[in-house]
Amino acid sequence: MSKKKKTYQNTLSEKEAKKVIAKLADEIRHHQYLYYVKNQPEISDFDFDQLFKRLRDLEEEFPQFKDLNSPTLVVGSDLDKDFEKFQHKLPVLSLINTYNDDELLDWVNKTDPDGLYSVEWKIDGASIVLYYENGMLKNGVTRGSGGIGDDVTDNIRTVRNIPLRLPEPITVYLRGEVFMTFKDFEEFNELSSGKYANPRNLSAGSIKQKNSADTAKRPLRIFTYDATFPGFTKKFKTHQQILSKLEKLTFPVPPDTVFVNGSKIAETIKDFKKKKDTLGFPTDGLVIKLNDISKRDAQGYTSHSPRWARAYKFDAIMKESRIVDITYAVGRTGKITPRVEIEPVNLAGTTVTFATLHNQDYIDELGVGIGAIVRVAKRGEIIPAVEEVITPGKDVFKIPDYCPSCKTKTIKKENLVDLFCPNPDCPDRVKNGIIFYCQRKQMDIEGLGDKQIEFLYDHGYIRSIADLYDLKDQKEKLIEEEGFGEKSLAIIFNGIEHSKQKDFRFLLPSIGLPELGHKVTELLIEHGIDSIDEILSIAKDKKRISSLLEIPGIGPSTIKAFEENFSDKRILKLIARLKNAGLKLKADPIKVSDQQPFAGQSWCVTGSFENFQPRDKAMDLVVYYGGRKVSAVSSKTTHLLAGPGAGSKLEKANELGIVVYNEKQFLDLLKSLKINFKNTI
C-alpha cells in the first residue's frame, strides 16, 4: 500500500515555499555537479533523492514557483571543457530511484501489475553511449547534459571488451556502463599507491583522461543494457529481444538478467540480494524495466526519466569495527570535520580505515568514543560513515572550542550545525585552499599534490595561491630540498605555467570563494558576466548586484557571498596578483561544431513543441551549432523560440524587440541552414 504523500501547505507560506524551492534547487545542482563532473559526491544517493523528492513535491504544490531550469526537469551533467562536444542521437535520461519493496511494488501496480519485467544488475560505473555506423564504432560519448555529451571515443576504443567492428554492417546506438572489477581495481590501485577511493571513481576518471594511452593502461570493461537500431527493418517487440540481439553482435550484457511477472518481482529481488556479495563487479542496485516495447511507448517519458523503468537501490552494507582514534580536519572554508580511524574492514570491494562523523550533533546522537564497537556503511556505496554504536567506548568525543590548527575560537554559522574556524590565515585553511586550487578539476597543476603543497607551505615557500606563480624564483633553494630534484621541479613549473591557459571558467571556482563554484560561474557566463573585471564592476554597484537575483539558480546566499568577497581587500589583492602573473581573467568562447550558424546569438525558449520534447532539445541544437542558451529574456537575448503556452517571456521579448520564432519558422530556419535536426538531436 502506498503511503500518503506529505504536503507542505499547512507548514509553509507561499513566501517561505518560494525560498525553500530556490534553496533546494541550488543545493541539488551543487550535488549534481559534484557527482557527475567531479566524481566526488558529498552525500549518499539516498540523501540526494530525498532532496530531489522534496523539491518535486514542493513544485507540485506550489507550481507558480517552479523554474523552467529546475533540476527536476533536467538530467545531471558530466560535461568537461577538455573534450569536443557531441549531440546525442537518442534520449540519455536518468532513472527514478526506489529504496524499498513497497515503493517499487506501488510503481509496478500502477504501471502494469500483470506485465513482464526485466530485472538486471545496476552497474556502478561511468555511463557511456556508443554509436556504431555500418558495423564500425564511430563515437563513444558520455551522458553529459542528456542532450550533449563529451566525445571520448579515443579512450573508449581502449576498453578491452568493446567490439570495434560488429559481425554485421548494422547501425546501432547503445547505452552502457564502463566499470572495473574489484580484482582489477585492487591490483591497479596497489600499483598506484592506493590513491583511488573506489572502482566507480577510477572508471569515471579513466574515460576522461586527456591521453588515451593512459586510459589503455587501466583495466576497464563495459556492460551494455539498451539499444536503438535506426533504420532497422525488423522491429523489436521486447527488451529481451534487444538484449539477445546485442549478445549476437558480441556486446557484453549484464549477467543474471531475468524476466518475471510483476507479482514475482519482490521474490526476485531477494534472490538478487543473496548474490550481491559474491559479484566480482560493483553494483548499487537493480534496474526493473517493462519488457514490452509497445507498453513502454504507451508509458512514455518525463523530461527527466522514462516512466517504464525504476532503479531499486540496495540498502548500504554494514560492517562492524572498532574505533581506534578520532581526529578532525580543518577544510579550506574553515569547516571542522571530525572523522574516526577504525580497524580495517572491506566494504563494497574496498578496504576502509576511516569513516565520517559529520558534526557534533551527529556524534552526540550516536555517542561516539574511542574504543567503541560501531557499524560502518558506505552511503550510496561510496562514502564510508559510522551508522550505529553497538558498544560504547570512552567518553563521547567533543570537537574543541578552538581551531586545532591556529587556536582561533570556533564559530557556528547561521542555520548550520557545523563549527568553523573564522581565521582566513589559518594554516590548514590556506593549505587546503591551495590544494583545492591545484586539483585536476580546478587549475590542474601537475606535480603539486597534497604532500608537496604541505611541504612548500610548512617551509615558507608559499602562503597563497598567488605565490605559486613566483615559485620559480626560488628554484636554487628548492632544488636542495628532498623530493624536489631537477625533474620534479620541471614538472611542477610546467604545470604552473600550463595553468595560465585555464580561463575564467576554471579560475573563479578554483579560488574557492563560498557560493562561487563551477555551477554559479557557468550561470554568470550564460548571462554575459564572463570576466573578473565584469564581476568587480558589478560588485561596486548595489543595484547590479541585486539584479543577479534575476538569474535562475542564484539566490540570496550567493548575493551575500558576492558582496562580501569582492569588497574584501584580501581577495582584491589576490586577484590583482593573479592578473599580474598572466592568468586569463576572461572566459574563452566554446565551440562544439565546425559549423557555427548560430555564433553570436543568444536564444531563449518558452512554451511547448511537437518536434522538441523536452523543449531544451531545441536549445541543445542552438548550442551545438555555436549559439548560447539563456534561461531568461533580457536585452542581451537575440532570439526567442516560442510555442503554445508562452507567457511572460514572449511579452518581454516583444517589449524589447527581440526576434521571435514559432516552431514552424524555426524548422524552416534549420532547413535553410541545411541542418537535419532529426539526425542531430
UniProtKB/Swiss-Prot annotation:
One of its GO terms (biological process) is DNA repair. The keyword Hydrolase does not apply. Residues 593-681 form the BRCT domain. It comes from the Bacteria. Its cofactor is Mg(2+); Mn(2+). GO terms for molecular function: DNA ligase (NAD+) activity; metal ion binding. The active site is at K122. Zn(2+) binds at C403, C406, C421, C426. The keyword Lipid biosynthesis does not apply. PROSITE patterns: BRCT (PS50172). Pfam families: BRCT, DNA_ligase_aden, DNA_ligase_OB, DNA_ligase_ZBD, HHH_5, Nlig-Ia. NAD(+) binds at D45, F46, D47, F48, D49, S94, L95, E120, R143, E177, K289, K313. Its EC number is 6.5.1.2. It catalyses: NAD(+) + (deoxyribonucleotide)n-3'-hydroxyl + 5'-phospho-(deoxyribonucleotide)m = (deoxyribonucleotide)n+m + AMP + beta-nicotinamide D-nucleotide. CDD domains: BRCT_DNA_ligase_like (cd17748), LIGANc (cd00114). It is an enzyme of class 6 (ligase). Keywords: DNA damage, DNA repair, DNA replication, Ligase, Magnesium, Manganese, Metal-binding, NAD, Zinc. Belongs to the NAD-dependent DNA ligase family. LigA subfamily. DNA ligase that catalyzes the formation of phosphodiester linkages between 5'-phosphoryl and 3'-hydroxyl groups in double-stranded DNA using NAD as a coenzyme and as the energy source for the reaction. It is essential for DNA replication and repair of damaged DNA. This is DNA ligase. It comes from Leptospira borgpetersenii serovar Hardjo-bovis (strain L550). The gene is ligA.
